[in-house]
């Protein structure tokens, strides 16, 4: 079993983009920005615990940081990890959470 404090550090934020919105509508998949060292099993456990939904599958990828310039200096942004979490049929995550 994964410790609860680790589960809280795995998911950093939902990743909102045009592609993630299209994927969410078509395939019941939610996209998260996750810790770079997070495993698929940790991501699955964290989503199931935090959002109380059943997860059908997890796919991950690492985005390489871009090279940026500030005058003559060249720097590089950090690499980051993205997770596509497919939810079980009938499950849904509401990020707004506003109940009237």
Curated annotation (Swiss-Prot):
This is Large ribosomal subunit protein uL23. Part of the 50S ribosomal subunit. Contacts protein L29, and trigger factor when it is bound to the ribosome. Keywords: Ribonucleoprotein, Ribosomal protein, RNA-binding, rRNA-binding. The keyword DNA repair does not apply. GO terms for cellular component: ribonucleoprotein complex; ribosome. It holds the Pfam family Ribosomal_L23. Belongs to the universal ribosomal protein uL23 family.
């Amino acid at each position: 079993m994964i410790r609860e404090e680790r589960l809280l550090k795995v998911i950093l934020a939902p990743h909102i983009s045009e592609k993630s919105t299209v994927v969410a509508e078509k395939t019941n998949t939610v996209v998260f920005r996750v810790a770079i060292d997070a495993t698929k099993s940790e991501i699955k456990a964290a989503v199931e615990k935090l959002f109380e939904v059943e997860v059908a599958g997890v796919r991950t990828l690492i985005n390489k940081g871009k090279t940026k310039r500030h005058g003559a200096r060249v720097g590089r942004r950090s690499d980051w990890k993205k997770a596509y979490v497919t939810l079980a049929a009938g499950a849904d995550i509401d990020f707004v959470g506003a109940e009237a």
